[in-house]
Structure formats: C-alpha cells, structure tokens
C-alpha cells in the first residue's frame, strides 16, 4: 500500500505531459510573400523545421510528387506548370500544411500576402509588373472605385483593416504607352476571433487517462485509511482483551 500511493501520483504527473513522440509541423515560407506571381518571376521556398544533427535534407513535394531534397526550393523562372500545392518535411518535423502557388500570365498582377485579414491587421497591396518593368500612373481600385493614385509604383497600405475594406481590388498603370489592368482579387475582413476552448484540444487525449488515474488515486487513498482504521481498531480490541484476561482471579 505504501508503494502504491507514490506510483499512482507519478502516473498522474506523467499523464499531464504532452507525448514526446508528437513532432511539430514544418512550415513553408515563400519569397516573395503571398502566392501570386507572374510568369518568369523567381520564387524561393524555405522549409522551417528541425533536423537531426548532421542531416539537413528536406523533402519537397509539388502536388504530392517528390521534387527535391534540398533545404530550400528555388524556381528561377516561373511558368504556369509551377502552379499548385507545395509541402515540405524535415527529419524532426511532420509534413507541412500545403502552400498554394498561382502563376499568372499578364502585364500586371495585384499581390497581397494573404486574402483573409482579421480586423485591425495591416493590409499591403502591390501592383507588380511582368519582368519588373517600370509602371507609371498607378491606381488602386476597390469595388471599381478609385482608392489611391501615384505617379510612381507605390504600394497601397491600409494600417488597420475594417469591415468596409471588404471587396474586390485591382490595380491599373502605364507600362510604356500601354494602359494595363490587373485581375481582381477578393479581400475578406473577418471580425476579431471569439475566445473558445480550442486551446484545450491538444490535451483532450490525455484527459480520460488522467481522470482514471485520479479515481484510482482516490480509491487507493480510501483503502489506505480504511486499512489504517481497521488495524487501529484491531489493536485496541487486542489490548482490551489482554487487560480483561489479567483481571481474572
């Protein structure tokens, strides 16, 4: 009984710890940021994830097909065939979430690091030209209404996203004597995240085991004190019978 109590307590402590076998997911980082480029643009994907000592190999997948084992994956001149889903994995990480690459054909492309923003986040839109040709008289539009004009090619910056920034955006500018427009991109602004119990989800697999251990601990403790009372009562009964025997003539 004395040995059972400490072992149960140790099991309770161990059950609260995350499993050491769970590996973090690798993360794909793209340069330039976002997932929209024009043909002949260069793109670099970097895989963030731990590797065993002395082993720096990385698995790169394009649409599910293994394409490289280098630390990073470089596309020198993008083509439409490079569009698709990219994932990576290192020696001490799980396969990353997919990152989409869209390779577009055109003179201008509206680039954004993401299409869904939370309220309060900054928004940066860039009017990118094919082969980085100079662009003049750049205009940015939201829902076909002009929002910004510049003689040079400067970005459209919104310090804090609000609901009125939802909409369809595109840019227009002069490349030489050509008046070109980009395709439209839908920008979505979401409200602030609602607090929830999702942070507890990683620990749900451990909760049933912890509950069982707690019940065992309670039962063991109850048995221990019940045994102590039983021994104490037995000892008192034995002492009383001994005293009564000495008083006989």
UniProtKB/Swiss-Prot annotation:
**Marked site positions, Important for receptor turnover:** 220
Regions crossing the membrane: 199-219
Residues covered by the Ig-like C2-type domain: 24-104, 119-172
Q: Which GO BP annotation is one of this protein's?
A: antibody-dependent cellular cytotoxicity
**Keywords from the named record:** Cell membrane, Disulfide bond, Glycoprotein, IgG-binding protein, Immunity, Immunoglobulin domain, Membrane, Receptor, Repeat, Signal, Transmembrane, Transmembrane helix
Q: What is this protein called?
A: Low affinity immunoglobulin gamma Fc region receptor III-A
User: Where does the record say carbohydrate is attached?
Assistant: 55, 63, 166, 179
Name of the coding gene = FCGR3A
Q: Which CDD domains does the protein's record reference?
A: Ig1_FcgammaR_like, Ig2_FcgammaR_like
Membrane side Cytoplasmic: residue ranges: 220-249
């Amino acid at each position: 009984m004395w040995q059972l109590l400490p072992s149960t307590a140790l099991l309770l402590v161990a059950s609260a710890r995350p499993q050491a076998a769970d590996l973090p997911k690798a993360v794909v980082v793209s340069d330039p940021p976002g997932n929209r480029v024009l043909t002949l643009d260069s793109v670099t994907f970097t895989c963030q994830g731990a590797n065993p000592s002395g082993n720096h190999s990385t698995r790169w997948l394009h649409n599910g097909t293994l394409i490289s084992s280098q630390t990073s994956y470089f596309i020198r001149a993008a083509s439409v065939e490079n569009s698709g889903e990219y994932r990576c994995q290192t020696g001490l990480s799980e396969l990353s979430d997919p990152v989409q690459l869209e390779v577009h054909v055109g003179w201008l492309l509206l680039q954004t690091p993401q299409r869904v923003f939370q309220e309060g986040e900054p928004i940066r839109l860039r009017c990118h030209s094919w082969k980085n040709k100079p662009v003049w008289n750049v205009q940015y539009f939201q829902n076909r209404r002009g929002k910004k004009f510049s003689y040079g090619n400067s970005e459209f910056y919104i310090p804090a996203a609000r609901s009125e920034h939802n909409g369809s955006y595109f840019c227009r500018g002069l490349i030489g004597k050509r008046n070109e427009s980009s395709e439209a991109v839908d920008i979505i602004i979401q409200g602030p995240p609602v607090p929830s119990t999702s942070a507890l989800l990683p620990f749900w697999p451990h909760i049933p085991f912890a509950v069982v251990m707690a019940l065992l601990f309670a039962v063991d403790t109850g048995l221990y004190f019940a045994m102590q009372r039983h021994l104490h009562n037995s000892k008192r009964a034995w002492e009383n019978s001994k005293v009564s025997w000495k008083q006989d003539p």
